[in-house]
Swiss-Prot record:
Annotated residues for binding of AMP: T31, R36, E57, L58, V59, G85, F86, P87, R88, Q92, R156, R167
Subunit note: Monomer.
Name of this chain's protein: Adenylate kinase
Region (NMP) location: 30-59
Residues bound to ATP: G10, A11, G12, K13, G14, T15, R123, T132, Y133, G207
GO molecular function: adenylate kinase activity; ATP binding
Catalysed reaction, written as an equation: AMP + ATP = 2 ADP
Record keywords: ATP-binding, Cytoplasm, Kinase, Nucleotide biosynthesis, Nucleotide-binding, Transferase
One record GO biological process: AMP salvage
Amino acid sequence: MRLILLGAPGAGKGTQATFIKEKFGIPQISTGDMLRAAVKAGTPLGLEAKRFMDAGELVTDELIINLVKERLQQPDCANGYLFDGFPRTIPQAEAMKQAGVAIDYVLEIDVPFEEIIVRMSGRRSHAASGRTYHVKFNPPKVEGLDDVTGEPLIQRDDDKEETVKKRLEVYEAQTKPLIEYYTNWAKNGDSSTPLKAPQYRRISGLGSVDEIRERAFEALK
């Protein structure tokens, strides 16, 4: 099982990724984790990545793809792998294809933006303990106060509505085009690569976590 998980920030990809990797016994491939591990290990690719990072520059797609290929050689990828958060752009997807990275499924978790804004902007947390609440789905007993200590709850900057909207705008511009890219490849094939076209699956990300999990498993049969 080799798959890519697509969906907007706040669509629930991380939660479903955990279920999928446990069910199929495959690792979740995170480019951030790969970069940190390669830098820490001092591999040639890691040292090259460190030069970019130390200079405050984005690591090139070519270097990321080389790291991906290196990571996929590890024994834990023998039965497959799950990409969550990569590729983010068409050039990255194209580079993966040209590098011969095989994908069986692309699974999109579809959630309307209005719902994502409600989900993310409603989060509240107690800074000292890490306890989390949601003004709509899991409210504290007393509005704005932690259940245990009675101390004020905070809203993280990442969860503020204007920040959420900006993240969704970036997704719309950079990552959403991947939906069309993979849909077209799945439907029409691509003679420029020997790779077999992946199957494209779209599921609704609305409902309970368990309902979405069952939809995901059904889509990957």
